[in-house]
Amino acid sequence: MSTSICPCGSGNLLDACCGHYHAGHPAPCATALMRSRYSAYVLGLVDYLVATTLPAQQAGLDRHAIGAWSAQSTWLGLEVESSEVFGGQPEHAFVTFTARWHDSTGEHSHREQSSFVQNDGRWYFIDPTVEVKVGRNDACLCGSGQKFKKCCSSYL
């Protein structure tokens, strides 16, 4: 059992916090998933970052670039500003946060409102940088069975 503090900023032990999700347990909400993804960047867990991205987008991720950015950065902290959950099936959410890090070019901060979708009991990050080929009347990328225009289109 790890005695290290979780990098997400909760103050809890890693194993009792994000490490639980890194080990395969589903995050109970979008905020927990977002925090666990930040921790995964800190810890270099590229497989986890890919696995928690919307499955239809996973092939478009640059695993090498993710790993390099993770390894070349000193992570300075995470601040979750807000979380907004929208009902419906599937459930969607926005999480607004600021992440800070230092790399060879200096100190940086990034503020973002990320989109998430829950499907089959798991939350997924919807990556706005990964282009997807889907028509408005096609089945949604998240696997809900709904048309894309009625489901995730407004979150991309």
From Swiss-Prot:
Pfam families according to UniProt: SEC-C, YchJ_M-like
Stored InterPro entries: NTF2-like_dom_sf, SEC_C_motif, UPF0225, YchJ-like_M
Entry similarity comment: Belongs to the UPF0225 family.
Protein name: UPF0225 protein PFLU_1319
NCBIfam families assigned to the protein according to its UniProt record, in alphabetical order: PRK00183.1, PRK01617.1, PRK01752.1
Gene3D superfamilies reported in the protein's UniProt record: 3.10.450.50
HAMAP family: UPF0225
Extent of the signal sequence: none
Species annotation: Pseudomonas fluorescens (strain SBW25)
